[in-house]
Swiss-Prot record:
Protein name: Nucleotide-binding protein Dtur_1129
Binding annotation for ATP: 10-17
InterPro entries, sorted: P-loop_NTPase (IPR027417), RapZ-like (IPR005337), RapZ-like_N (IPR053930), RapZ_C (IPR053931)
Source taxon at top rank: Bacteria
Organism: Dictyoglomus turgidum (strain DSM 6724 / Z-1310)
Keyword terms: ATP-binding, GTP-binding, Nucleotide-binding
Family membership noted in the UniProt record: Belongs to the RapZ-like family.
Presence of the UniProt keyword GTP-binding in the record: yes
Pfam families tied to this protein: PapZ_C (PF22740), RapZ-like_N (PF03668)
Length: 294
């Protein structure tokens, strides 16, 4: 996506920090609670990365000194440089904000000694009224789930640039069941039904990265069929995960020791997905049985 700036402001307790986390998942470089005067400098630093940082998202709240004046000045600088930008103003019903503060036990930034949260909310609304009028988008989060907030923010971001997509990260891990299933796995595939190279004395010393073991495993029709079924399943599932708002998918492929069969199958799935997605590969247990094999 072309470089763009996303400014989050609004009422305390309305979801600014959560919105920033969502934008981080969308590939923005994110900074929380930054003074408006520093934003133009931060933009320069981002642009100097030659495209490595394609979007900047910042949270600016009322605690900044000379908030209104410096905020307006920041917006004018961004406009003068013809940088696409959005100002998202978040708000919520008074009772919802009070409930959120009671649940988190955090202190409202404008809460004065002896005052109440409601009084602080009303004071903040007064101070932010002019900023609200500058907003390109105003969102009331009173009845939003996190998923619904994600959907709204994605729509706002794509209105700036239609090519934006979440940074969807896929990690493929081969493992041995004898060492335990990866605790962060979303999908687990058991390949212990495949013939085991461990029982061939000539293949036993090699890992699934070797041509010898790869050739043995992939020569089996059931292995090739299994790989094709997994590819079709992932082609079906991954777009649904993306649509749902997920940004991480951990796929675990296991055999007995995690040295032979799982490594081969994990490699094949990685080779298939890597050209289309941000994909990482980890062979967790490939070296754990080496001392046994010698």
């Amino acid at each position: 996506m072309d470089f763009q700036v996303f400014i989050i402001t609004g009422l305390s307790g309305a979801g600014k920090s959560q919105s920033l986390r969502i934008l981080e998942d969308l590939g923005f470089f994110c900074v929380d609670n930054i003074p408006p005067k520093l934003v133009p400098t931060l933009i320069d630093l981002c642009l100097a990365t030659n495209g490595k940082i394609s979007g900047l998202a910042v949270v600016i709240d009322i605690r900044t000194e000379n908030f209104l004046e410096s905020f307006k000045e920041m917006v004018e600088i961004i406009k003068s440089r013809n940088i696409p930008y959005k100002i998202l103003f978040l708000e919520a019903k008074d009772e919802v904000i009070v409930k959120r503060y009671n649940e988190t036990r955090r202190i409202h930034p404008l809460l004065k000694e002896g005052g109440t949260i409601l009084e602080s909310i009303r004071l903040e609304k007064e101070k932010l009224w002019e900023i609200r009028n500058l907003a390109t988008d105003i969102v009331n989060t009173s009845d939003f789930s996190i998923k619904e907030l994600k959907e709204v923010i994605l729509k706002i971001v794509t209105s700036l640039n239609t090519t934006v997509k979440p940074n969807f990260l896929i990690t493929i891990t081969s493992f041995g069941f004898k060492y335990g299933v990866p605790i962060d796995a979303h999908l687990v595939f058991d390949v212990r039904f495949l013939p085991n190279p461990f029982y061939d004395p000539k293949l036993r010393p090699f890992s699934g990265k070797s041509e010898e073991v790869r050739g043995f495993v992939l020569s089996k029709k059931e292995a090739r069929d299994f790989i094709e079924h997994i590819k079709k399943l992932l082609d079906f599932l991954i777009p649904l995960y993306e649509e749902e708002g997920r940004t991480v998918l951990n796929i675990a492929i296991g055999c007995t020791g995690g040295r032979h069969r799982a490594v081969v199958i994990a490699d094949e799935i990685f080779f298939y997905l890597a050209p289309k997605y941000n994909t990482h590969l980890l062979h967790r247990d490939i070296e754990k049985d080496v001392h046994i094999l010698k």
